[in-house]
């Protein structure tokens, strides 16, 4: 599998902070009442099903954003295949922090691992052929960088990151092009002339 590079921290951290604000709000009442603020606790993140892991660095960032004293030790790498009951990470830190960050960290990890697992299943289906599996822009708003990273963790490939990456002429574009008195070939020529050197694709069904 190709080497994986997580999106820049400056792009991921706002998502982590948003997720923590959403979940923690004014504070974790249960953990504040029932978990000590100091001391050390070790927890393990364990796979519940066979699949492909993705998002471990993001999960680590969740805990460290809550408390820099937390130590996150990944036992596998993103892109690894895991089986049920297999430990994937160990987290050590104050009990209250671990309980507060648990759900947010797992939400990132489960979502990204689910995408990676689905991508791997499709890649496996075309293995041995010349076909390649690409993603789309149909991602959760704001989460495109992480969703597309998870696709790569599963062994598939990224298509356009955004509308400015390339031309992708689809049926809707041909519909609007007809209003400009352009046929199929004319629409393609016009798009190509608009920005030479930019990749151009035509969707077929």
Language-model region placement:
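Acidic/glycine-rich phosphate/pyrophosphate-binding loops and surrounding catalytic core
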Residues: 2-205
């Amino acid at each position: 599998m190709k080497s994986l590079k997580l999106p820049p921290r400056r792009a991921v951290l706002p998502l982590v902070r948003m997720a923590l604000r959403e979940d923690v709000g004014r504070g974790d009442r249960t953990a504040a009442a029932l978990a000590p603020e100091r001391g050390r606790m070790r927890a393990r993140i364990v796979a519940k099903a066979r699949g492909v892991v993705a998002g471990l660095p993001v999960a680590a960032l969740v805990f460290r954003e809550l408390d820099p004293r937390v130590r996150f030790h990944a036992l596998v790498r993103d892109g690894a295949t895991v089986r049920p009951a297999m430990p994937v990470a160990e987290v050590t830190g104050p009990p209250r922090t671990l309980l507060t960050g648990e759900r947010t960290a797992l939400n990132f990890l489960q979502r990204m691992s689910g995408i990676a697992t689905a991508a791997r299943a499709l890649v496996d289906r075309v293995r041995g052929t010349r076909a390649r599996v690409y993603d789309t822009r149909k991602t959760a708003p704001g989460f495109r960088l992480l969703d597309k990273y998870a696709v790569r963790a599963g062994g598939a490939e990224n298509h356009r990151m955004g509308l400015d990456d390339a031309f992708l002429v689809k049926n809707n574009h041909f519909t609007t092009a007809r209003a400009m008195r352009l046929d199929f070939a004319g629409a393609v020529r016009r798009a190509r002339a608009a920005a030479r050197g930019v990749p151009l694709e035509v969707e077929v069904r």
